[in-house]
Regions:
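ATP-dependent helicase/translocase motor core
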Residues: 1-129, 138-154, 175-179, 185, ...
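Conserved helicase ATPase motor motifs in RecA-like P-loop NTPase domains
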Residues: 105, 209-225, 249
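Conserved helix-turn-beta segment of the N-terminal RecA-like "Helicase ATP-binding" lobe
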Residues: 137-164, 348-354
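Inter-Walker segment of RecA-like/P-loop motor cores
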Residues: 151-193
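Conserved RecA-like ASCE ATPase "motif II neighborhood" in helicase/translocase motors
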Residues: 177-211, 413-418, 434-436
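Interdomain helical connector at the RecA1-RecA2 junction of SF1/SF2 helicase-like NTPases
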Residues: 226-328, 342-365
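A short beta-strand element within the Helicase C-terminal
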Residues: 433-434, 438-455, 461-463, 478-482
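Conserved segment of the helicase C-terminal RecA-like domain
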Residues: 467-494
Length: 498
């Protein structure tokens, strides 16, 4: 652990960490406004019990990605986790409700869950079982991998701790495992005999559900009418909101640009509140998706028309090739078929842009201009793109109706670890096309440009734009590009969730 200060400003980090990951320690309690001067850091870190606590419970070694990174808790994580620990200490008084842990997306919520689990299992008798709940397979894998890579699973593979079925979950809970990772859907036997363990079970719910001793982790706050979550988990145990995270440089600011309204040839459907809410529904089955598209056939037709998609694809190529040094990009489309169509159109315009740049290098230009064009040309030629969508039954036939072939995309998704490639700053996979996957709980620090061409609102919109707010070396901000017209929904979401 290294502390750096000139007296007026102070930061703390770990040996070998880049400057972007040295952070301020400017609060002694969550209520403090914040003071970046040295005395605050000295009182917060160097006080004997705090220093011992930090060294013992708030340092991790993350072995993901083939390298080992030393992680020191940030100020907000240290304060929030310790408040949650105190709630657990008084769990009988709290009737098992440990509260809602609201730390905004991108501020290290997964690490906070690891810190909390680590400290409780070290400092309290009885070795409580910690059950981590999510509602998607990809999130379940991500959080279990985080626990494994940070060494909390005793050198064992995360797969051994994942409940594969409702029966497997029940069998695991009847034992005394250190950890269980499960989808909430696995609790599917409401009439089964209750399990009565002789030890504590702590349920950490990523976006909140009902259990024994329980704490709900969330990246967005409870809305005023969300009484179920409050009744289940209790009130907030820790708050670290969107604005404070940006002020503390725990996340980078997000800049918004409405490019859709600048494109005169772009014909957008009129999306009212009802349509936006329905189109925004997550994880629809193929039959539900088909029913939805029939119900709003006119709007969907306009949204997915070839002429419109080509306008968006062409503008994406022009824009992203202009900001090519900024980082990686994610394109969010309406559905799986549209993702593949957008991929094809972008490939077409990408190659045309490459040809245009080649022609420019052959024209009269200064040596400096030619060198810059050649650098850009090399980058564009090397850049790889991928479609990332979940698999469904009869998908080959579904795509054939649109004269599309999903097979090469599916093979790429199955044979390669696209998530790891996209997270690797040096990997040539720089653009992904998604509609639902990777929009929540997927942390890519070098993702800087998010292109939205799908109606979204509220919680889903906030989760999505947060993909671009992670801190990375040389990254000053994330950019949200709007083609569909989400500005009203974005204002409402920011009002509700920040």
């Amino acid at each position: 652990m290294i502390m750096l200060s000139n007296g007026m400003e102070s930061r703390v980090g770990t040996v070998g960490a880049k400057w972007e990951f040295f952070h301020e320690w400017k609060r002694l309690t969550e209520m403090d406004h914040g003071n970046i001067e040295l005395p605050t850091m000295l009182r917060g870190i160097c006080k004997k019990e705090n220093l011992i606590d930090l060294i013992e419970n708030f340092i991790l070694f993350d072995h993901s990605g083939g390298t080992t990174v030393k992680i020191l808790a940030r100020n907000h994580q240290y304060l929030g986790v310790n408040q949650a620990v105190e709630m657990y200490r008084h769990r009988d008084v709290m009737k098992g409700k440990l509260g809602v842990f609201w730390h905004t997306q991108g501020s290290g919520k997964s690490y906070s869950m690891v810190f909390l689990a680590q400290k409780i299992r070290r400092k309290f008798e009885g070795s409580p079982t910690i059950v981590v709940l999510t509602d998607r397979d990809e999130l379940n894998k991500q959080i279990s991998d985080t626990f494994e890579n940070c060494g909390l699973l005793g050198g064992l593979k995360a797969k051994q701790f994942i409940a594969q079925s409702g029966d497997d979950l029940r069998e695991k809970l009847m034992g005394n495992p250190s950890f269980v990772f499960s989808l909430i859907q696995k609790f599917n036997k409401a009439d089964a005999e209750p399990i009565r363990p002789d030890h504590d079970i702590i349920v950490m719910s990523d976006e909140a559900h009902r259990t024994q001793n329980r704490i709900g982790f969330t990246g967005t706050p409870l809305l005023r009418d969300d009484n179920i979550t409050a009744r289940t988990f209790g009130q907030y145990v820790s708050i670290y909101d969107f604005k404070r995270a940006v002020e503390d440089k725990a996340t980078v600011p997000l800049y918004y640009e409405n490019r859709g309204e600048k494109l005169q040839e772009l014909k957008n459907p009129k999306i009212n509140e009802e349509i936006a809410a329905r189109l925004d529904e997550e994880e629809l089955t193929p039959s539900q998706q088909a029913k939805l598209e029939r119900e709003f056939a006119q709007e969907v037709h306009l949204l997915t028309a070839e002429k419109r998609l080509r306008v968006v694809a062409h503008d994406f190529v022009r824009h992203y090739s202009d900001v090519w040094t900024s980082g990686k990009a994610m394109v969010v489309s309406f559905n799986k078929v549209t993702c593949v169509r957008m991929y094809n159109y972008v490939q077409e315009y990408w190659q045309k842009e490459i040809e245009e740049i080649r022609k420019k290098t052959e024209k009269d230009a200064s040596q400096q201009e030619v060198q810059e064009l050649k650098r850009k040309l090399k980058w564009m030629e090397e850049t790889e793109m991928a479609v990332v969508v979940s698999q469904e039954q009869n998908e080959i036939q579904t795509f054939k109706k649109w004269h599309l072939d999903i097979t090469p995309h599916r093979e790429k998704m199955e044979k390669r670890e696209l998530d790891k490639e996209f997270k690797d700053a040096d990997n040539r996979l720089r653009v992904v096309f998604v509609c639902a996957m990777w929009l929540t709980g997927f942390d890519v620090k070098t993702l800087s440009c998010l292109y939205i061409d799908k109606p979204m609102k509220a919680h889903t919109l906030m989760q999505t734009i947060a993909r671009a707010n992670r801190v990375a070396e040389g990254k000053t901000n994330g950019l949200v590009i709007d083609y569909i017209g989400i500005v009203k929904a974005l204002r409402q979401a920011l009002a509700d969730y920040t």
